[in-house]
Amino acid sequence: MTSDEFSALLQRLMAAAEAGDAQAFAACFTPDGIYHDYVYGDHTGRSEIAHMISDLFHRDAQDYRWEMFDPVCDGCIGYAWSLSCFISKVPEFAGRPVVIDGMSRFELKDGLISDYSESVNGGVAMAQLGVHPLRIEKVLQRWGKQLQERPATRAFLERPKRTKS
């Protein structure tokens, strides 16, 4: 995939996400693609990814906006920095605006996304929503544990400094 093709794919992905067009969003992924979301968990396959957009993202948020900047791609892996914002529809936090930034990682296959993950500071989002500090702490501790348990993190921690397998 060229850099221009990657940028075009990102434009389709963002437009579909903002419009709540779950099928168009899922079509940006391979049939067995995976979307790793730090709030809603992992979604595998176009059907689950479409469900995530229509029945989770747009259930819980309105006026969703997502832009990606400075995309880079080597043909197989792509990255982009993003900004997104929304207004919460979750009853406990209804009407509260949130803006977050993050770094997105895309594994690419046959012109589509085969694996998507992101690094977003969810603590910033929770603070903007007005989540109680003890609840934020509990969530951040869980995310920290999940990071520690990832195979890539374990491999990183087990090898000596300045080495890579």
What residues fall within each predicted segment?
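Short, low-complexity N-terminal intrinsically disordered segments enriched in polar/charged residues
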Residues: 1-31, 146-165
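Helix N-cap and loop-to-helix transition residues
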Residues: 2, 21, 44-45, 121, ...
